[in-house]
Amino acid sequence: MSSTFRNLCRSSPWKWTSLRFEYLERPGTGANIVRAWLRRPGALRLETPDGQLLHSTTGINDSRDDFYVSATRRSWLLPAHLVTPVYDDAGLVRRRPEAAYGEPSFGNGRLAAALDPVELAGNAPVPMEFPDSNPVSLEEPREVDHEGRVALETVVTRGRSYAPSDPGEPLAHQGRTLIRIDAGTGVCVASQSLDGDTSGKGHWLKILGVDEYMLDDLFVAESMNLTDVRRHISWDIGPAA
């Protein structure tokens, strides 16, 4: 079960392309919930619970010629969903290839890490001879219900090789941390520090929709007044002749 948990932590980039969710930093209250729409790669919209816009990605259709002309090796990496990882028998990612990883986060490193929690597992399994070199050690994971979805829950303890994507906002705190990973998306839907000065700190994420159709109009600064094809369009043909 531990290997399943770690492989699930590596799998997020290949399990979904768009996500609609609510996010809460803990400790916090319902007033601090953020509603989010995310479409890979790089498109993010954030609102307050009452619909006030907090952030919307701009420039998602801009030319990237300056980026490629920079001619760095990283600038030519493909998005993760365009490269093929090594899968285990359950269809989870055992070994991640080199790719252009990264999630939009609007300055919140924990949110970006939660969307792709590979920092809890590393890009590949560690050698059997050195099990202590895992980024975190795990208690036996178990299946739980999280907001109506199946998740794997465990308590993790940081190892010497743990390297959070944002050192200031890690998923795993010093001491023990309760972690939940959504089984369908590979997203870390909950974290909570259990020890020390950080006790109670973490996050809670509620998934509302996966792989929904999202127009560009949702993410740009000004509406392009595009038609949402999901909505019924009525045709008024006037009175009969």
Which sequence ranges carry the predicted segments?
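Short beta-strand segments enriched in hydrophobic/aromatic residues
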Residues: 25, 50, 158, 193-195
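Short acidic, gly/pro-rich beta-turn/loop elements at beta-sheet edges
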Residues: 31, 56, 164-166, 189, ...
